[in-house]
Amino acid sequence: MDYIITGLGNPGERYTFTRHNAGFLAIDYLAQFFNTKVDKIKFKGLVGSFEYAGKKVLLLKPMTYMNASGESIIEAVNFYKIKPEKLIVIYDDIAFDVGVVKMRKKGSDGGHNGIKSIIQCLGTEEFPRIRIGIGVPKYDMVKYVLSEFEDGEKEKIFRAIEKASNGIKILLESDIDRAMNYINGDVVV
């Protein structure tokens, strides 16, 4: 494998379309985008793989629940001997309005427990991540992130996921800097 792309979320039908599962939704979209399925059980998660632009990619949805995501990811990283810069993590972020997408090469956990778990397990903050804005909580944080998107927000989230997926495509075709320029800017593919 050349890359691992993982999306963070919680397993179970009741969480499928919740704000905290933006990462899982992105992985599902990527699976369709690259014509694969994420349905094999491995690394305490569900996996699928594809090859694009000469690169082999593993898609991973940790089934450990959000706060223990690192346990699943470290197993895959160690198995494939992937360097942290070849691990791309997609997750929800309350710091951005619904539908805003941002990519960066590294950073702190920003208060996100899934990212905190990954940093603990990897022993580094130096892995790329794509953050999908889910909006600032209007009420209790836990209830908010575990609530479903409102009707007017769903289209914004799916446009954000589409933009993130196009960014992944650019990354695989070229490099992370071009992907970041696309995702963080107003560039249209």
Curated annotation (Swiss-Prot):
Coiled coil: none annotated. Keywords: Cytoplasm, Hydrolase, RNA-binding, tRNA-binding. TRNA binds at Y15, Y65, N67, N113. The record marks D92 as: Stabilizes the basic form of H active site to accept a proton. It is found in: Cytoplasm. GO terms for biological process: protein quality control for misfolded or incompletely synthesized proteins; rescue of stalled ribosome. Disulfide bonds: none annotated. GO terms for cellular component: cytoplasm. Monomer. Belongs to the PTH family. Hydrolyzes ribosome-free peptidyl-tRNAs (with 1 or more amino acids incorporated), which drop off the ribosome during protein synthesis, or as a result of ribosome stalling. PANTHER family: PEPTIDYL-TRNA HYDROLASE. This is Peptidyl-tRNA hydrolase. It comes from Caldicellulosiruptor bescii (strain ATCC BAA-1888 / DSM 6725 / KCTC 15123 / Z-1320) (Anaerocellum thermophilum). The gene is pth.
